[in-house]
Structure formats: C-alpha cells, structure tokens
C-alpha cells in the first residue's frame, strides 16, 4: 500500500515478481533476439524472442518434454536436460536465420553453473552466439551428469534400498542413473546428427 506522496507504486508485473523492467529495457535496447529461459517444477522452458513494434514474437519455443523424441530417459529438469534443450533451441534458431541472442533469465539469480546457463551453453554449441562469462557455464562433467552417476554408484554400494528409492523414476524408465553420462552422449549425438542433416538439406536446396 502507498504510504506517502512521493511513494511510487511498482508496475503490477514487478510487484508480482514476474518482470524486472530495468533489465528488460536494456535487453530491448540491444535490438537482438532474446534467449528466454524459465523454470517450472518439472520442466525447463526456452524461447527465442524478438521484439516487434506490435509486441514480442516467439520464433522458437520449447520445453524439455521435447527430449523424449530423442529417447531421453533422465529427468526433465536437471542440468543435462537443460543443455540438450538449449542444443535443440539453438539449432532451430539457426534454421530461422538467427545467429546471435542475448540471455534473458528474468528474475532468476545468475548463479554460476545454474541450469539456465546450461541451456545457454547448449544454444552456443548449436552455433548461436550468446555473450557470457565463462565462469557461469556449468562444467562438462556436470552437464554430462557425472555427479549424478558418481553419487548413484556410491549409494548403490552403501545403501541399495535408498538407491532404489532415490532413483526410482530413473529405474522405472529403464535408465540406471550410473549410466547417465553415456546416455546423455547418446541423446546428444542423435540431436546433433538430426539437426545437422536438416540444416545441410536446407542449404542444398
């Protein structure tokens, strides 16, 4: 509630914790496409958005459920899934002629190694330039899920029942969590081969 004559009531979306208008203005002034990354409890969402006179236009928009198309059996909200989502979004952006973008993480804290930066890394590896500092990018080991695999191996040896409970969803999908890094590489290879072929065909036309 306003408390004085000089008190300024924030914009509704800022009050609701949805939009940082100062940051958004800087992004819009750059005149570059925005790589918008958002999180839900179960999935990650990534979009390539272009500001138009009539409003924002989403030219690419996907969430991690798309990974099942390539046989992904891991969780859909972890670092590995975030990277793979970024990889697909990056390839789709290239197919639409987009060569660079600026990361827009909204009100998320820019914590080094966070999943939003794993999405960004995937987009970059697909061939789209995104300005960033190397210190925020998750390590290759973390992107591959090495930390999950190591923890799973240790837990399986020390507490088999706890292992089954902790990784029940992985096991139900037919993926032993200690095999996550190799599974990640298999899915990544499928994505790269699929989209590289599509891009090559588009160029050959």
Curated annotation (Swiss-Prot):
Molecular-function GO terms, alphabetical: 5S rRNA binding; structural constituent of ribosome
Function statement: This is one of the proteins that bind and probably mediate the attachment of the 5S RNA into the large ribosomal subunit, where it forms part of the central protuberance.
GO biological process: ribosomal large subunit assembly; translation
Keywords recorded for this protein, A-Z: Ribonucleoprotein, Ribosomal protein, RNA-binding, rRNA-binding
Protein name per the record: Large ribosomal subunit protein uL18
GO cellular component: cytosolic large ribosomal subunit
InterPro entries associated with the record: Rbsml_uL18_euk
Gene, per the UniProt record: rpl18
Assembly notes: Part of the 50S ribosomal subunit. Contacts the 5S and 23S rRNAs.
Secretion signal, residue range per the UniProt entry: none
Assigned protein family: Belongs to the universal ribosomal protein uL18 family.
């Amino acid at each position: 509630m306003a408390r004085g004559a000089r008190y300024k009531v924030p914009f509704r979306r800022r009050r609701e914790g949805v939009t940082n208008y100062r940051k958004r203005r800087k992004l819009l002034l750059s005149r570059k496409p925005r790589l918008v990354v958002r999180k839900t409890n179960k999935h990650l969402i990534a979009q390539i958005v272009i500001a138009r006179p009539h409003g924002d236009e989403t030219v690419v928009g996907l969430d991690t459920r798309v990974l099942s198309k390539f046989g992904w059996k891991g969780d859909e909200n972890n670092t590995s899934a975030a990277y793979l989502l970024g990889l697909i979004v990056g390839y789709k952006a290239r197919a639409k002629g987009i060569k660079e973008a600026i990361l827009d993480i909204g009100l998320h804290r820019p914590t080094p190694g966070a999943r939003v930066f794993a999405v960004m890394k995937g987009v970059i590896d697909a061939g789209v330039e995104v300005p960033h500092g190397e210190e925020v990018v998750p390590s290759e080991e973390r992107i591959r899920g090495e930390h999950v695999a190591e923890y799973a191996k240790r837990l399986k040896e020390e507490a088999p029942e706890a292992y089954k409970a902790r990784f029940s969803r992985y096991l139900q999908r037919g993926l032993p969590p200690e095999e996550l890094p190799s599974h990640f590489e298999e899915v990544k290879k499928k994505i790269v081969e699929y989209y590289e072929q599509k891009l090559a065909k588009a160029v050959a036309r």
